[in-house]
Structure formats: C-alpha cells, structure tokens
Amino acid sequence: MNYQKFAHVYDQVMDQQLYEEWTDYAVRSFSHSAKRPVRKVMELACGTGEVLMRLDDKGYEVIGVDLSKNMLEIAEKKAQGRSIEWLQADMRVLDDVPTTDAVTLFSDSLCYLTDFEDVVSVFEAVYDHLEEGGIFLFDVHSLYQMQEVFPGYQYHFVEDDFAFLWQSYELDEPGSVEHVIDMYIKQEDGNLFEHFQEVHEEQTFPIEMYEVALEMVGFTNIKVKADFGQSEVQETSPRWFFQAVK
C-alpha cells in the first residue's frame, strides 16, 4: 500500500501516544532480549518517521525504509538536520539495504501483506539483514481485533481544512478486513474540498503460523506478548507483539 493522499493527513489522525509506546517497547526489547549490543536500527514501513526520530533522540543510528515515496518525503522534511538515512524499498526484498543490529516493523504494517508467502519473504529478508544476535520486532492486529472489532467500525476526524472518514468491513477470508478511507481536503483557494478515497486491505494469520515461519527461517527466542510486550496474550488482546532473535 503506497498511502498516496493518506500520507498527507497521516500524522494528524494517528494517536501520538502510540509512537511513544512503540519506542519504549523497542528500547526495552533491545536491552533485555537482543543477543548483541543494539546501536544500528532499521525500521521497515517507517511511515513519516515518528518512531525513528524518537530512537534517534535516544542515540541510536537509524535507517528508515518505506515503499511509499509520499511517506518518505514527509519524513525527510520533518527530520531535517538529523543524520537519518531514508530508503524507498519493498520490505519483501530489501535490495541494497545495509545490515543492522535490530529491525522493527510496527503499526500493524505486516497486516498489509495478505498473502502469507509475502510475510515469509519479509521474515527471510529481515533475517538476511540482521547481524548475528540481532533482534526483530513487529506487531499485528489480533484475530479478535480483525474479526470482532473492525467489522462495522467507523472513525471520523474533522478539522477546518480536511475531514477524514474511516469505515471497516469484514471480508470473506478469515482474519481479513477492508478499510475504506474517504478524505475531503480543502483546496488552496479555500472555497472547495476535493474528495479522495483509498481502500486498504489487511490480513492477520494465527499466531502459530507466524511462529512456525520465523522458526523455519532461522529465528530463535521467539516470544509473543500483548500490551507492547508487557502482558501475556489474552483472547481480547487488540495487538500481538512478536520478538525474534537471529
């Protein structure tokens, strides 16, 4: 998903507190679970760079990778004056991307790969780009979130210069949903709003499928938690947080 128009309103509709929680989760995991000192971090599907800039503030050497040119352009503007490397790349392949001590993939970005073979390709690419003892962190929506919460879900966000309407629908494939996003953005003359629509599909697979795939690729010390790694997974946990070590 390239997030064409969505990129321009992404930061305004995202819960900023989540960025703090992802950052804290990453730093805790680097310290407690990696089998090597973590100095260099790569974030896949980095979006507009909010987590990366927080990691940069904490002294990590960081690299941001995203498929969306629009997202990266916004991230680069926000991060002017910082020594952050930004790369446009497909996380299933990661050609010409350096190895790092840690790789993160947050904000349920892995759910946008609806074919499990693509998920495995990401695991393989990450494994190849981690130093020995490096750690891989990612999260996905839980099956409870996908099957019980999202169907029929609506979210509206309105400002003076734009309106954002999000509606979610259950799809036929178990664990899959479609998000229909309508955006009304005020034009420069201030008199008219232009309408854009994007349709995003997400898919979550059972925990065991992720665990087996990680193990087959070669990862060890695989753990799955909820609440940003601070509690055990429950039936109603909204997200699953995975960590795996090379």
Give the location of each predicted region.
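Conserved class I S-adenosyl-L-methionine
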Residues: 1-45
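Class I SAM-dependent methyltransferase SAM/SAH-binding core
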Residues: 42, 49-93
